[in-house]
Design a protein with these regions (language model features):
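Short Gly/Pro-enriched turn/cap motifs at secondary-structure boundaries
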Residues: 29-32
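C-terminal binding/interaction regions
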Residues: 2-9, 13-24, 76-151
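Short beta-strand scaffold segments in enzyme catalytic cores
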Residues: 34-43
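Short, well-ordered amphipathic alpha-helical segments that serve as non-catalytic structural scaffolds
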Residues: 20-23, 65-73
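Compact, glycine-rich, soluble single-domain proteins
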Residues: 53-67
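Histidine- and/or cysteine-centered catalytic micro-motif in compact active-site loops
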Residues: 42-44, 53-54
Length: 151
């Protein structure tokens, strides 16, 4: 299957993401805040993945919709997220929280596009100077080299 890039996105892609996010939102478990959220993303291989928020009486363990989306991404074969949409119960765009921006970043195509309340934005715009696997490797790789030099 050919790879989809953000430059290939059409209005039809965004409409499909919005509809899937709305459908996912209907499955949200939000008995405490009653703030239901659905998220959907297009994967570089053409798949669509989605998730909904799942609240918990211990608010700190509540799962955002993006958590479910990334779990589905991994469960269905992984890949890179090309486009992302998140909606509330009224169908309005929701911005991912900081934790979810980092979570999405881990699985994002380099030029992933997100539908934000203020318009379309790249992953670098919503999470500038993001922490990536390259940051980990830079430190771990340097520590490995130092350990080897000391032996």
């Amino acid at each position: 299957m050919s790879s989809i890039a953000p430059t290939d996105l059409t209005d039809a892609h965004w409409q499909a993401l919005h509809e899937l996010a709305m459908e996912a939102m209907t499955h949200a478990y939000a008995p405490y805040s009653r703030f239901k959220v659905g998220a959907a993303a297009l994967v570089d291989d053409g798949r669509l993945v989605s998730g909904c928020n799942v609240e918990n009486a211990g608010y700190g363990v509540t799962l955002c919709a993006e958590c479910g989306l990334v779990s589905e991404l991994i469960r269905t074969g992984g890949g890179r997220l090309v486009a992302f949409a998140c909606v509330d119960a009224l169908g309005r765009a929701c911005a991912p929280c900081g934790r979810c921006r980092q979570l999405l970043s881990e699985h994002a195509a380099d030029d992933m596009v997100l539908a934000m309340p203020s318009g379309m934005m790249s992953i670098d715009e919503v999470l500038p100077d993001r922490f990536t696997a390259a940051d980990v490797e830079r430190v771990v790789g340097e520590e490995s080299r130092r350990a080897a030099d000391e032996q």
